[in-house]
Every structure is written in C-alpha cells, then in structure tokens.
Amino acid sequence: ISTDEVYGALELTRPAGCESGGGPFGEEFFTEETKYDPHSPYSASKASSDHFVRAYHDTYGMPTLVTNCSNNYGPYQFPEKLIPLFINNIRRGRPLPVYGRGENVRDWLYVEDHARAIDVIFHRGKVADTYNIGGFNEWKNIDLIRVIVKTVDRLLGNPEGASEKLITHVADRAGHDLRYAIDSRKLKDELGWQPSLQFEEGIEKTVRWYLQNQKWMDDITSGEYEKYYQSMYD
C-alpha cells in the first residue's frame, strides 16, 4: 500500500487563480506505467519499498501486489494531516498555516473508498501487478481549505466565512511537489472499482466526525504533539 508521490510531480496547466471544484488541473495523470521519480526522502523511501516488494516476487515467487493511492481523508486520521489539522485549528481559533500560496494540487479520496479498493485488489487483483487508486478529484490546497472553513463554520453555527481570517500563509516546505493526479481507470476497467462517495458528502461526514469526537482529538494533540506543532508552525 503505497503513495502517488513515488511518481514525482505533474505540470499544472490550468490558469493561476482558477478555482478547483474537483476538476483536473492538467492533461497528464500518473498511470501504472509512469516511471518512478521521487523528489523527497519520504517518497524515495516509499519507492524503495515498492521495488523491494517486486524484487521478492521476481526472486522468490512471493505473490505480491502494489497499490499507489492519492491523498486520503476521513475519520481517525492523525491530526498533523491537512484536513483534521484545519478542522481542529478552526475549532480552537488557531491560525490555519498554508504553505506558500496554497497553489499545490492534490487528488482526494475518502478513506472507506480506499479500503474498498484494497479489498477488491486483494481478492481479485492479478498477482505481481500494480494498481493506482484515485478519486479524479483534484483540489488546490487553498480552495480545499476554504471548503473546510465554510463547512466547520456552518456546523459550529459561526457566521459564514468567520474563520477565513485564521488563514495564514507560511514559507513553503522543502520538496513540495506542485501537482499529483492519479489515473485509476485500470482499476475501474479490470476490477469494477470506482469511488462511491461524492467529495461534498465526504467532507461533510469528515468534519462532523471530528467535531463529534473532540476528546479523541484533544487526547492526541496534547503533550508531545503540541511540541511538534509548535516546532512546525509557531
């Protein structure tokens, strides 16, 4: 179970300032045939793991499968990740740190759809094959953040847009690739999988879950996590 980051980065060809809305931001997508081109130590380590798994099949005949998925969202995600981080910060009135201009584009998939894809691939996938898992649901970070702000404010009973003042642009992080976008048509055509949840419904479910499980979030974000957060953003 790997990541789309192993493929490197794609060009962003839609005009600057164009809103996301879940549509594609370019004509190119990562396919199972895309050559690996990791740009960070993290993605290089994931690429190495993928090759290690394939080598075990080639050398020892071990039955293997590799999946590469786009960004996940949903319940129980560790709060350092963008969506739970911003939900929690809005709830607590803390700044919403946006790397650079927020123009980086990611494809988002609800976690239960990812789990369902893994189940289908595990039981019906071709041994030693690779399958990409994605939502065809691209969002610029800044546009996604505005959706989160609007949803959280509405569910908390805040005036519309009240928390937008918390958006704070910070220095971009090293090795921050501009665009990832998965082509998962192979998985759809061969095994019949496709996302079942529309993004708007998934975000609503996700925000509601974190707001209804504040103790879970507070327990995790206390202690050492708070030290990590301060080292990253304060």
Locate each region found by the language model:
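Short beta-strands and strand-loop turn motifs
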Residues: V66-C69, Y99-G100
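Catalytic helix-loop patch of NAD(P)-dependent Rossmann-fold dehydrogenases
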Residues: E5-V66, Y73, Q77-P79
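Active-site proximal helix/loop that lines the substrate pocket
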Residues: T3-G8, N71-Q77, E103, H123, ...
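Glycine- and small-residue beta-turn/loop positions that connect adjacent beta-strands
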Residues: I1-S2, Y99
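C-terminal substrate-binding subdomain of Rossmann-fold SDR/epimerase-dehydratase oxidoreductases
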Residues: C18, P84, I90-D234
